[in-house]
Swiss-Prot record:
Species of the source: Trichodesmium erythraeum (strain IMS101)
Listed InterPro entries: PSII_Ycf12_core-subunit
Family: Belongs to the Psb30/Ycf12 family.
GO BP term, pick one: photosynthesis
Localization per Swiss-Prot or TrEMBL: Cellular thylakoid membrane
NCBIfam families from the UniProt entry: PRK13686.1
SUBUNIT field: PSII is composed of 1 copy each of membrane proteins PsbA, PsbB, PsbC, PsbD, PsbE, PsbF, PsbH, PsbI, PsbJ, PsbK, PsbL, PsbM, PsbT, PsbX, PsbY, PsbZ, Psb30/Ycf12, peripheral proteins PsbO, CyanoQ (PsbQ), PsbU, PsbV and a large number of cofactors. It forms dimeric complexes.
Membrane topology reported for the UniProt record: Single-pass membrane protein
Function, in words: A core subunit of photosystem II (PSII), probably helps stabilize the reaction center.
Entry GO CC: photosystem II; plasma membrane-derived thylakoid membrane
Protein name: Photosystem II reaction center protein Psb30
The entry's keywords: Membrane, Photosynthesis, Photosystem II, Thylakoid, Transmembrane, Transmembrane helix
Gene coding for it: psb30
Length: 43
Protein backbone atom coordinates (compact mmCIF):
# COMPACT_ATOMS: atom_id res chain seq x y z
CA UNK A 1 0.00 0.00 0.00
CA UNK A 2 2.94 2.30 0.62
CA UNK A 3 3.93 2.05 -3.03
CA UNK A 4 0.55 3.36 -4.18
CA UNK A 5 0.59 6.31 -1.78
CA UNK A 6 4.15 7.19 -2.83
CA UNK A 7 3.19 6.89 -6.51
CA UNK A 8 0.15 9.17 -6.23
CA UNK A 9 1.93 11.70 -4.00
CA UNK A 10 4.64 12.16 -6.65
CA UNK A 11 2.18 12.89 -9.48
CA UNK A 12 1.79 16.59 -10.26
CA UNK A 13 -1.93 16.78 -11.01
CA UNK A 14 -1.80 20.52 -11.79
CA UNK A 15 0.64 19.89 -14.64
CA UNK A 16 -1.51 17.03 -15.96
CA UNK A 17 -4.60 19.28 -15.85
CA UNK A 18 -2.80 22.09 -17.69
CA UNK A 19 -1.52 19.75 -20.40
CA UNK A 20 -5.01 18.25 -20.77
CA UNK A 21 -6.59 21.69 -21.22
CA UNK A 22 -3.88 22.67 -23.72
CA UNK A 23 -4.51 19.50 -25.72
CA UNK A 24 -8.27 20.14 -25.74
CA UNK A 25 -7.77 23.69 -27.04
CA UNK A 26 -5.31 22.56 -29.71
CA UNK A 27 -7.65 19.78 -30.88
CA UNK A 28 -10.77 21.99 -30.85
CA UNK A 29 -9.56 24.28 -33.66
CA UNK A 30 -9.13 21.69 -36.43
CA UNK A 31 -12.27 19.84 -35.27
CA UNK A 32 -14.40 22.96 -35.77
CA UNK A 33 -12.92 23.53 -39.24
CA UNK A 34 -13.50 19.89 -40.26
CA UNK A 35 -17.10 19.97 -39.02
CA UNK A 36 -17.80 23.19 -40.94
CA UNK A 37 -16.20 21.75 -44.08
CA UNK A 38 -18.27 18.56 -43.85
CA UNK A 39 -21.46 20.59 -43.53
CA UNK A 40 -20.49 22.73 -46.50
CA UNK A 41 -20.58 25.90 -44.43
CA UNK A 42 -18.57 29.02 -45.12
CA UNK A 43 -15.38 29.24 -43.13
Amino acid sequence: MGFLTDFFSNINFETIAQLTMLAMVLIAGPVVIVLLALQGGDL
